[in-house]
Amino acid sequence: MLVVALASSCTTTTTFNSSQEECDYALHYVLDKANESTLSKLFFRITETQTFISDDLSFILQHADEIPGIRKLLDEWTQSMSRYTLDWFEGFTTYTTSLAKGLQFDDPQKMVLESDFSAALTMESVYGESILSYVKTTLKGADLTKWDEVAAQYNAWTKTRMAMYGEENPSLGDVDIVDDMAAYISMLYFEDLKASETLLRTTPDPNADPTVAKVFGLD
């Protein structure tokens, strides 16, 4: 039995009576569920929303109506990447699911009390670089010729604006689109994983697993 002091306007004490084994079970349970939810959201965000432009490169979209032909090139780029995503996402799903199931928690009780997304934080800490590397390696198999056309058109426009009006615009320079997209997808994955875990751990569910409900105080 773990006795925890909670800080507030006055000090109170509450009893946390879930064992390490129960906490470990509950954390893995919500992590698995959060991963399932995250993968569904992520697939939608990088296919149905038709972006494939990271926040760091959003300046391209901001100027898209001013750059001749770039809307068409952007459409072709997103269509190409959407088709490719259908091929690699199944492998990504299997990979992250396996990592989540095999993740070890050093102190499950402490993790339950630390934050509402401590399992996702541990997943990111332990496997963040591995997931980034996996996405990067996978994206290297994509056809990037459409991106090369987008970059060439955008860079030509920036040079023209500078020559004619002395106007400076962000440059793509030597942007590696594989590195950029891998970082973006990994960021979205962990962002959604934390949000999904938080929702599962703070929302009462009449059909919830009894052990999980007990550990997170939802019973």
Where are the model-predicted features located?
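N-terminal Sec/ER secretory leader and immediately downstream segment
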Residues: T13-F92
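Solvent-exposed aromatic/hydrophobic patches embedded in short alpha-helical segments
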Residues: A26, V30, A34-T38, Q104, ...
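C-terminal motif of bacterial Sec signal peptides marking the signal peptidase cleavage site
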Residues: L6-S9
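An amphipathic alpha-helical core segment
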Residues: Y134-A182
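Mid-length scaffold segments of soluble, non-membrane domains
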Residues: T78-T145
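Sec-dependent signal peptide recognition
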Residues: M1-V3
